[in-house]
Amino acid sequence: MSTPQNRIRNFCIIAHIDHGKSTLADRILEETGALSQREMTEQVLDKMDLERERGITIKLQAVRLFHRAEDGQEYQLNLIDTPGHVDFTYEVSRSLAACEGALLVVDASQGIEAQTLANVYLALENDLEIIPVINKIDLPSAEPERVKQEIEDVIGLDTSEAVLASAKTGAGIKEILEQVVTKIAPPKGDSEAPLQALIFDSHYDAYRGVIAYIRVVQGTLKPGMRIRMMATKKEFEVTEVGVFTPHMTFVDELKTGEVGLVAASMKNVQDVRVGDTITAAQNPAPAPLPGYRKVTPMVFCGLYPVDTVDYEDLRDALDKLKLNDASLIYEPETSDALGFGFRCGFLGLLHMEIIQERLEREYGLSLITTAPSVVYRVTTTKGEVMEIDNPANLPQVNKIEIIEEPFVKATVMVPKDFVGTVMDLCQGKRGIFSNMEYLGINRVMLTYEIPLSEIIYDFFDQLKSRTKGYASLDYEMIGYRQSELVKMDIMLNGEVLDALSCIVHSERAYTRGRALVEKLRSLIPRQMFEIPVQAAIGNKIIARETVKAMRKDVLAKCYGGDISRKRKLLEKQKEGKRRMKQVGNVEIPQEAFMAVLSIEE
């Protein structure tokens, strides 16, 4: 049975992490009878174990539900679950583009957080109808009236009809569904027009190849059609179209306004880009849907297998992850210290942690990761512009005209008691103050422009610890700016460890170098000979510590006796240590590579 276009509603849920988005989605599935009681698990839509454990949504999911509204009609509701995290902003923006409305879920005790705001602005840019939902009203600390006021003050949404709900107890779920039906507009579009469908996610299926999640904007999609991707110009023949009713179910066609999936024996996730438009090869649409852009990684790091024989396994694992995650990029690289590995690019720190954890968990690899770095832009004296994602590749100082680094606009929301300490932190991270705004009586929104390289180290951890966990952060790229940057090398026993090189601001280089060598001295196990640990910029050593040698008591056998006898033994030991030092290698523990991240200056 097919639903007429005016009875289709496409909506998504916007919320900050932990405001109860996935639980609310569970309740909605339960209310509409999409799943039997037996199949209900917590967070049905978060399919990966990792998502469940961390309580975050990483990949998008889309579900088709049927709901009989109070007017007696049956409506088709397509719920698109979105990730709430900064790193996945582009994915969120694409899934918002596939909807006509959004539920804005706000925690009744915590109020609005930074990422809620960021996503609301994205939703407003896409002209979505926003339905405010105050969640967790069953909590003793809930203050729904204050939160309503906050939403009105900060976002300017009318909250007189906001739904008070509790995803835990199931209160208010019926009202939410009624509001979805009455307030959100049905999809526009003409089912006779040339096909236009927006891809908002994809995943790889071992039997069917790549499966694209799509929203049909114009026209109709049926099995057997030849389709063309408008950004990559690739053509395929559709084998199956279907929907998720959380389980994959195949249907005869997807009509205008519907959300579903399409399989067309596509072998490579690269061909199916999020945000791209699918059209018919015979009768193509005149223009693609707006808003597509290529995803650019922001953070890079090196991944090396602990045991070099695992190199091929690591490559296979990355290939497989890449099938599901088009935003991951990687290329082989070698390091003198760590052997063969890959240089990988990620959307952000959370994305990086998740990929590392999936490699270790799903593919059983043990990895060494180098400190993350951002992409610097270097203009050489010859006028060439280079993008450097690995500090080891930075040209020599005398060949560099200017170095630029990426800046972000960071929005931090904090209770007003912590404003001082947060401003202090941002200035310490070379932040430039741009704005401060009071939201209600107790909360402040601070806006800073900060170099991305300062944020990827330990900004978030420090922010949380200085504000007792109350602050929330959101950031977006604002472009490149010129900075005084230098490359700092770490030398062990006189040899440069390329994996520990980092690019630092020249004012910070000394303190950073000092802190790093002290940290390394405590982490590197003592050897039979002494090891100098040095930080150098170019040829100039700026800091040094020494890992002292262990020594055997060679005088144990001499009872009394002549001093020259003892001296002979000590000289012999000293000579042995000197020879050992020339040939000796130093084993470096994994903690040493992560030390770069956690040093307090």
Swiss-Prot record:
User: Which SMART domains does the UniProt entry name for this protein?
Assistant: EFG_C (SM00838)
Report the GO terms under cellular component: plasma membrane
Give the record's membrane topology: Peripheral membrane protein
Main subcellular location: membrane
Q: Where in the cell is it found?
A: Cell membrane
Annotated GO MF terms: GTP binding; GTPase activity; ribosome binding; translation elongation factor activity
The catalysed reaction is: GTP + H2O = GDP + phosphate + H(+)
InterPro entries recorded = EF-4, EFG_III/V, EFG_V-like, EFTu-like_2, G_TR_CS, LepA_C_sf, LepA_CTD, LepA_IV
Give the enzyme's EC designation: 3.6.5.n1
What is any one GO biological process for this UniProt entry?
positive regulation of translation
Q: Which UniProt keywords apply?
A: Cell membrane, GTP-binding, Hydrolase, Membrane, Nucleotide-binding, Protein biosynthesis
Q: Which PROSITE patterns match?
A: G_TR_1, G_TR_2
Do you know which Pfam families this protein is assigned to? EFG_C, GTP_EFTU, GTP_EFTU_D2, LepA_C
Summarize the protein's role: Required for accurate and efficient protein synthesis under certain stress conditions. May act as a fidelity factor of the translation reaction, by catalyzing a one-codon backward translocation of tRNAs on improperly translocated ribosomes. Back-translocation proceeds from a post-translocation (POST) complex to a pre-translocation (PRE) complex, thus giving elongation factor G a second chance to translocate the tRNAs correctly. Binds to ribosomes in a GTP-dependent manner.
Q: Which PANTHER family match?
A: TRANSLATION FACTOR GUF1 HOMOLOG, CHLOROPLASTIC (PTHR43512:SF4), TRANSLATION FACTOR GUF1-RELATED (PTHR43512)
Q: Give the UniProt family note.
A: Belongs to the TRAFAC class translation factor GTPase superfamily. Classic translation factor GTPase family. LepA subfamily.
Query: What name does UniProt use for this protein?
Result: Elongation factor 4
